[in-house]
UniProtKB/Swiss-Prot annotation:
Keywords: Activator, DNA replication, DNA-binding, Early protein, Host nucleus, Phosphoprotein, Repressor, Transcription, Transcription regulation. HAMAP family: PPV_E2 (MF_04001). Its main location: host cell. This is Regulatory protein E2. Residues 1-201 are annotated as: Transactivation domain. Residues 245-258, 265-287, 330-346 have a biased composition (Basic residues). Belongs to the papillomaviridae E2 protein family. InterPro entries: E2/EBNA1_C_sf (IPR035975), Nucleotide-bd_a/b_plait_sf (IPR012677), Papillomavirus_E2_C (IPR000427), PPV_E2_N (IPR001866), Reg_prot_E2 (IPR033668), Regulatory_protein_E2_N (IPR036050), Regulatory_protein_E2_N_1 (IPR042503), Regulatory_protein_E2_N_2 (IPR042504). Residues 311-329 have a biased composition (Low complexity). Binds DNA as homodimer. Interacts with protein E1; this interaction greatly increases E1 DNA-binding activity. Interacts with protein L1; this interaction enhances E2-dependent replication and transcription activation. Interacts with protein L2; this interaction inhibits E2 transcriptional activity but not DNA replication function E2. Interacts with protein E7; this interaction inhibits E7 oncogenic activity. Interacts with host TAF1; this interaction modulates E2-dependent transcriptional regulation. Interacts with host BRD4; this interaction mediates E2 transcriptional activation function. GO terms for cellular component: host cell nucleus.
């Protein structure tokens, strides 16, 4: 008991010396967190052995001491990694390396230079909310290399540049749904108006809205986005401009290039006309074959009816030498039998065609699509029956597949950004980074998670085989009844 108290007092003295010195070096900050780790381990050991007090200090529970020790270990590892980078020689204070600053938005990042940002909703000064923008943000990429980025603010929110990508860590629209009634807000930085009130229905930098001229010049647009928004006339002009740019000193193409281009155009036009004529001939042959099949079926049915009628009349004539009443009754019975037989034969002859029609109708109704309410209904995997590519896609739409990735939140965000730039078309959508919360508290459980949705299982398979997952990120497959 006395030995634990002496060690605890020694650790308290070390912490007081660090606080009084207030050295702005990473070595001092690492020593501070190492001392906090030793203190948490000592308190954990004391509580485990039934000690509830060390002098005037109340020993916390095992869970609290364990959480503080893990936090201190994580901070020591982060600071040691930062010390090896080019930013290790910069001044770092206790506030810059504190746990509260490290966990504030953007989470798990070192930050410096806080700036107050005030957002006024509905032009009401009393209805305002304060945010913190950081001048400098330090983050790690997938290769565990440290980068220093500048932070900025616009009408959409507060962001920091991650290469050419704007990573927003505060979105004003999220709080506008709670505080604003008209959907308008005004952004002020250091009590100076930066953005005047604008409606939140189509804010800049958001899907469907236009970016500001000042901010749009900083982020380059990709070639796919610019070409997809052009009209056919604009695309022709763009191709002509590209051709003129390719010419050197504005000269016209030589006669050889003209001839080659003309021959290529002629070949393309000929191939197109041939393909059109072939498709027309195929359609004509199909229509002729279908009409011939219908005629042959109709002739066979009429012949069978004539044979039945002739056979019935011969039997009635042979037996009609008796009384006229009996012959008339028998002929009526024979006619009834003949009609019934012909009907029976007609039904038997038309049964395969009706089954084919029902199959075609079911296939056509299935290939037309599924209703929105049926999307995500099936919880079973798609069967391997021969339904065609379109039918398989429609069956898979009933059970949308997903991939759940787990890892560090910053690593998951970098992975999402890289996938959007390199692997567009191999997935449907990405979710934001999220985590599970304990049922009896607010502490987060495990690592951060992110969902990736797909249109089909084949698309998920192609994505999984093509994309390289970052180090420390694992995945699992699943599906939902709806998204």
């Amino acid at each position: 008991m006395e030995n634990l108290s002496d060690r605890f007092n020694a650790l308290q003295d070390q912490l007081m010396n660090i606080y009084e010195t207030a050295a702005n070096t990473l070595e001092s900050q690492i020593e501070h967190w190492q001392t906090l780790r030793k203190e948490a381990v000592l308190l954990y050991f004391a509580r485990q052995n039934g000690v509830t007090r060390l002098g005037y200090q109340v020993v916390p529970t095992l869970a609290i001491s364990e959480a503080k020790a893990k936090q201190a270990i994580g901070m020591v590892l982060q600071l040691q990694s930062l010390q090896k980078s080019q930013f290790g020689s910069e001044p770092w204070s206790l506030v810059d390396t504190s746990g509260e600053t490290f966990r504030s938005a953007p989470e798990n990042h070192f930050k410096k230079g806080p700036v107050s940002v005030e957002v006024i909703y509905d032009n009401d000064k009393d209805n305002a909310n304060a945010y913190t923008m950081w001048k400098h943000i330090y983050y790690q990429d997938d290769d565990e290399q440290w980068h220093k980025s500048a932070s900025g603010v616009n009408h959409t929110g507060i962001y920091y540049m991650q290469g050419t990508f704007r990573n927003y860590y505060v979105l004003f629209a999220d709080d506008a749904t709670r505080y604003s009634k008209t959907g308008h807000w005004e952004v002020k930085v250091n009590k100076e108006t930066v953005f005047t009130p604008v409606t939140s229905s189509t804010p800049p930098e958001s899907p469907g809205g236009q970016a500001d001229s000042n901010t749009s010049s900083k982020t380059p647009t990709t070639a796919t986005d610019s070409t997809s928004r052009l009209s056919p006339a604009d695309s022709r002009k763009q191709s002509q401009q590209a051709n003129t740019k390719g010419r050197r000193y504005g000269r016209r193409p030589s006669s050889r290039t003209r001839r080659t281009t003309e021959t290529r155009q002629r070949r393309r036009s000929r191939s197109k006309s041939r393909s059109r004529s072939r498709s027309r001939s195929r359609l004509r042959s199909r229509s002729r074959s279908q009409s011939s099949e219908r005629r042959s079926r109709y002739r066979s049915r009429s012949r069978s009816r004539q044979k039945e009628v002739s056979r019935i009349t011969t039997t009635t004539r042979g037996r009609g030498r008796g009384s006229s009443s009996t012959s008339s009754k028998r002929s009526q019975r024979a006619r009834g039998r003949g009609r019934g037989g012909s009907r029976g034969r007609r039904s038997s002859s038309t049964s395969p065609t009706s089954s084919k029609r029902s199959r075609r109708e079911s296939e056509s109704s299935r290939q037309r699509g599924i209703s929105p309410s049926d999307v995500g209904k099936s919880l079973q995997s798609v069967s391997s029956r021969n339904t065609g590519r379109l039918g398989r896609l429609l069956d898979e739409a009933l059970d949308p597949p997903v991939i759940l990735v787990r890892g560090d939140p910053n690593t998951l965000r970098c992975f999402r950004n890289r996938a959007k730039q390199k692997f567009t078309g191999l997935y449907r959508a990405f979710s934001t980074a999220w985590s599970w919360v304990a049922g009896d508290g607010t502490e987060r459980l495990g690592r951060s998670r992110m969902l990736i949705s797909f249109f089909s299982f084949n698309q998920r398979r192609d994505f999984d085989q093509t994309v390289k997952y970052p180090k420390g990120v694992d995945r699992s497959f699943g599906s939902f009844d709806s998204l």
